[in-house]
């Protein structure tokens, strides 16, 4: 009886990439901004506390600081302070994560469109795109450009809709539990390169130590089952 080979796998319809901590090493700059604000308020900035803010949009982080930590500022001023500090840190320079540009260029060579899906504000994303190369992305979705931010699925749903593809056919790339929750809730498959604990492998989730370990053409998880 002849052996029938399995059907050829299909590449993802799109690559939907988080920015901070995933493509560029800015997650620590964001957490440094949060830590500086906490210390100014006389509060502890332990690793456990800071992990709660990893991947969080500025407005969500500000609300959390005011409501859960009792900082002596209102939400609007807290958000402005965090945004100003984080933006200054990013403007001073960012480092691209190992393998990030190779992953994006490989996707482009394979005809897979890429979108940037970030909880950062538009002006921060634009700064980072100068380093990453805006030409590598078909579109970007930033904070406030979807009805709800991460961990809700809206940013990923918006990116998939903008590219005209089904989220279930997309591969999302994330580094935090907040972003991972958003991607999975949108129905995407997930490639996680964790910057903080909390993401575990699963039926739709692969976890790698570095994007340098990934080649879309050879990576089984990147293809729908």
Task: List where the protein language model places each region.
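Residue-level signal for inorganic ion chemistry
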Residues: 62, 118, 183
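Asp-based, Mg2+/Mn2+-dependent phosphohydrolase catalytic module
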Residues: 2-13, 105, 112, 121-225
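Ser/Thr-centric signal marking residues that sit
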Residues: 22, 26, 118, 142
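Conserved SAM-binding loop
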Residues: 23, 96, 114-117, 172-173
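N-terminal helical cap/lid subdomain that shapes the substrate entry/recognition surface
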Residues: 2-110, 123
């Amino acid at each position: 009886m002849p052996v029938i080979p399995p059907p050829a796998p299909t590449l993802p319809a799109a690559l939907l990439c988080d920015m901070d901590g995933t493509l560029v090493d800015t997650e620590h700059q964001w957490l440094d901004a949060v830590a500086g604000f906490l210390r100014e308020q006389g509060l502890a900035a332990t690793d456990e506390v800071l992990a709660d803010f990893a991947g969080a949009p500025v407005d969500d982080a500000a609300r959390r600081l005011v409501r859960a930590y009792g900082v002596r500022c209102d939400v609007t001023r807290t958000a402005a302070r965090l945004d100003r500090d984080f933006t200054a840190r990013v403007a001073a320079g960012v480092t691209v994560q190992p393998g990030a540009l190779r992953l994006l260029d490989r996707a482009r060579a394979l005809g897979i469109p890429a979108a940037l899906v970030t909880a950062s504000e538009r002006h921060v994303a634009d700064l980072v795109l100068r380093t990453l190369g805006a030409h590598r992305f078909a579109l970007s979705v930033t904070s406030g450009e979807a009805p709800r931010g991460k961990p809700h699925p809206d940013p990923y749903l918006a990116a998939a809709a903008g590219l005209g593809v089904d989220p279930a056919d997309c591969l999302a790339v994330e580094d935090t539990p907040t972003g991972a929750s958003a991607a999975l809730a949108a129905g995407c498959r997930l490639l996680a390169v964790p910057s903080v604990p909390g993401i575990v492998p699963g039926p739709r989730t692969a976890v790698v130590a570095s994007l340098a370990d990934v080649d879309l053409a050879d990576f089984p998880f990147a293809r729908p089952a």
